[in-house]
Amino acid sequence: MLFRSQARMLKDAGLNRINHNLNSSRSYYPNICSTHTYDQRINNIRMLKSIGFEMCCGGIIGMGESKSDVVDMLMDIREINPESVPINFLLPIKGTRLADRDISGLTQQYCLKVLCLARLMVPKSDIRCAAGREVYFKGIEPTLFKVVDSIFASGYLTAGGQGIDDTLNMIKEAGFTGEIESTDR
């Protein structure tokens, strides 16, 4: 969470876009976060937008939320109208609160449906497949490009990922071309 003065300093320094995910729906949020409320998160996003930041705002699927929670989260994201919507799929990591989370419901079909739903519900935003891409879409990754605008590569906040060269090769083999937004390898 940023104070207005901190956000203003970042904007004045040249920062244009900020990622501030909702992570889940309003009703499920207390199950995953105890440091601040959903409304504080929404208000922080509104403040950042009022300063002129482009927003990257998405969520994490597979933390125990219901299908209705996914829809509710996407409805709130649609209201925010971010430039970019990263959809992450839970990667349970040993030593974290969600390490033992049951992810058996995160089938390829379900995960693809979530991305399609994001595309339909937030049509003006770039839909991005982020964490979990290599796990949940193994063998069908090229299919993602029929639904999403971009994918993440080379790792995530808490887990490694497919390297950029392998990702670019996969994109090329699928008959697409790719651009790298960040030169950090």
Regions found by a protein language model. Name each.
Residues 26-32, 94-99:
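A short acidic, helix-capping loop that chelates divalent metal ions and anchors anionic groups
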Residues 5-14, 140-141:
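Distinct, well-ordered alpha-helical segments
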Residues 54, 58-59, 68-78, 86-87:
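Conserved mixed alpha/beta catalytic, RNA-binding, or beta-rich assembly cores of soluble enzyme
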Residues 10-26, 80-92:
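Non-cysteine beta-strand/loop elements that form the S-adenosyl-L-methionine
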